[in-house]
Amino acid sequence: KQTAYPVCGQGFTLTAALPAPVDGWEVGAYGIRTPVLARAETLPPETLDLVLAPCTAFDEAGRRVGMGKGYYDRFLPRCARAAVYGIAYEAQKVDAAAAGPLDVRLDGIITERGIYTWK
């Protein structure tokens, strides 16, 4: 198994990247370390087994709310065989997340209190 990391690109694209072993990281948006895409190996979304998606909110129906740019909304439908789990704090749980009709339902959420699963 390998661990790929998300790289946000122009046009609100998201790429799964394996960082190069030497000088493979840079500081990206929001001060977050991200793989240097020019030196990374990229993985096609359809080959991924598991995707961890950040959430600003989630509900018990498996709906997630992201940051509003749609990176994961465009990426997740291409991850047909992957289990998709959100990453959030328990305090981000809401009664009904404002997800849109194109949003991909999560298989579960991982919080500091445990793992919720729905599918």
Model-assigned labels for residue ranges:
Residues K1-T42, Y89-A96:
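Extended, well-folded interaction surfaces typified by the phenylalanyl-tRNA synthetase beta subunit core
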